[in-house]
Amino acid sequence: MSNVLLSKLSSELADLDGQVSQIDQQISQLRRKKAELIQKKQALERKIEMKTNEDSDVVLDRWDQDSFPWSDEANQILKNKFRLEKFRPLQSAAINAVMSKEDAIVILSTGGGKSLCYQLPALLAKGLTLVISPLVSLVEDQIMQLQKLGIDAASLNANTPKDEAKRVEQAITKGSTELRLLYVTPEKLAKSKRMMNQLEKSLGVGYLKLIAIDEVHCCSQWGHDFRTDYSFLNVLKRQFKGVPILGLTATATSNVLDDVKKMLGIPVAIVFRAGFNRANLNYKVLTKPGSEDECVEKIVRTIKRKFSGKTGIIYCLSRNDCEKLAKSLKANGIRAKHYHAYMEPVDRSAAHQKWVSGEIQVIVATVAFGMGIDKPDVRFVIHHSLPKSIENYYQESGRAGRDGLPATCILYYRMSDIFKQSSMIQQEQTGIANLYNMVRYASDTVTCRRVKLAEHFEEAWEPSWCQKQCDVCEKSSNSPGTATEDVSKEAVVVINIIEENLSSAKDGSGRITGNKLLDLLSKKLKGRRTKDFCEKLIVHLLLESYLQEDFHYTVYSVISYVVVGLKWRVYNRKDEIPMTLDNTKKGRAEENNRKRKAAVTSSDEEVDVGDDDDVITL
């Protein structure tokens, strides 16, 4: 090859290198521009949300008045029948809307008084209100409470005695009795043509006045608790024309609300939404100890020191966890009882009644212990394990402090719980996405807990409004601050561990679980990074899609493995991977970051990751 040709090729190569360098610079500029635009977009969304809230206030003012034809009677029924002095927020407005034949959706936090929004109109309208509720046990409890108030309410299910079923069916079709509320499950409506025919007759004689759908978020496939039998409810608006529909839930995002309206055929339903904030609740996220014995010891110490003699709930992931923890609490002198769906109904009821009466102090439960729990003086709710969604966490923690007095909500969090939970919910349509949102909440040690909840429920919120009623805001005044570090070098170590494990096993058995990955990474970075840092790094890479879970199904279980994620496959090795860390000495962290960028390494073992004491994680 001639020198002229070689020189020409070298020149072309240099030119291409220059073009590639320019493109890299343009990509970096575009990324920065994208970040700026995202910030502007989020700011506009917050303004729009605040404007929407203003519009909601206008709607509330229109309906929350005492000038309706039935207002005086409604107040009399409230005092004389329900023995209440005044309406809670949104109750009066919702009642006025459905009495005006308007479709409506009420979003009220757990314990906010949703039931009255259809129970009182049932007496006002002097006809039948059909209540669709998912749990038979909850239905039976409500009917018992209504009957104590002298209100005729009934249900139709597999356990209903024949004589009672006959009475109810005659009342539905003839409309000449005092039956005011009929409770059914969505399954009952979906599977019983006879039931639907009877309701049509009820409408024909002018007896059916209102349809109330409890836990209405279950209609939405994008909700945290979608139930297929709720899909049948899309026939109600067509089949029972002129009958208003009232949906009730404790939590619903805008997407879920839109989906519910579309599915039920009530696109212009009036939405009454209470603010998400419960000012009397103190939210805390604590690092879950590595061993179960240590975790039990910590919970026992917390209950004895801070909540001695006070009522509480502890939520666990599985029935086995419930039984073991309840046994451990009792062994430590705490009056506790387990509660889960696999218990006999009579045993569940007995545990519930003992807790309500104060005979036992703490109920240790799965999510089976939830809807319809009406005990105002719960002083603490502890989550022994990570909930499957923010909605679940908000509802479960919201069972504390219904009397308005101070209460504490404690969540114990550790990475290993992510994989336990994901293996249980991975087949739900939005299960993993909902779980990862919960992980973002739990793993964030910088952002006010109420800000995180507000973001999820699409409400405007300023950290200063929290009044130090969460662990983040409580420590912020004394906090040494945070530092954003580039963890791209450490990410390479993580990816190499995964790939080396796979390549070393010819039979494909080299897949690695999250817990095993943490052990190997901690050994690789021993003396340079703490185990807590390694845990936070894996979670960060998982949430940012540099890693992802891959599920393997066996006869007895579902196993979660961690594999290389989509984002890593398109990752430019020159780019940073920023991660925010609690930091005792921010300047030193930034200096270590600069050193890390400058380091030229040829193997994982040579990565300079700084000193252990630079970072306080989790």
From Swiss-Prot:
Classification via InterPro entries = DEAD/DEAH_box_helicase_dom, DNA_helicase_ATP-dep_RecQ, Helicase_ATP-bd, Helicase_C-like, P-loop_NTPase, RecQ_Zn-bd, WH-like_DNA-bd_sf
Where in or outside the cell?
Nucleus
- What residues does the Helicase C-terminal domain cover? 295-443
Indicate which residues the UniProt annotation says bind Zn(2+). Answer: C448, C466, C470, C473
| Cofactor mode of binding and number, as noted | Binds 1 Zn(2+) per monomer.
- Biased segments, Acidic residues type: 603-618
Q: Spell out the GO cellular component terms annotated for this protein, sorted alphabetically and separated by semicolons.
A: chromosome; cytoplasm; nucleus
Q: Where does ATP bind?
A: L108, S109, T110, G111, G112, G113, K114, S115
Q: What is its EC number?
A: 5.6.2.4
Which keywords label this protein?
Answer: ATP-binding, DNA-binding, Helicase, Hydrolase, Isomerase, Metal-binding, Nucleotide-binding, Nucleus, Zinc
List the GO molecular function terms: 3'-5' DNA helicase activity; ATP binding; ATP hydrolysis activity; DNA binding; four-way junction helicase activity; metal ion binding
Respond yes or no to whether keyword Zinc is given for this record.
Answer: yes
Q: Can the keyword Acetylation be found in this entry's annotation?
A: no
Cofactor(s) of this protein: Zn(2+)
Provide the Helicase ATP-binding domain boundaries: 95-270
**Role:** DNA helicase that may play a role in the repair of DNA that is damaged by ultraviolet light or other mutagens. Exhibits a magnesium-dependent ATP-dependent DNA-helicase activity that unwinds single- and double-stranded DNA in a 3'-5' direction.
Cross-referenced PANTHER family? ATP-DEPENDENT DNA HELICASE Q1, DNA HELICASE RECQ FAMILY MEMBER
The entry sums up its family as follows: Belongs to the helicase family. RecQ subfamily.
Name-wise, this protein is Putative ATP-dependent DNA helicase Q1
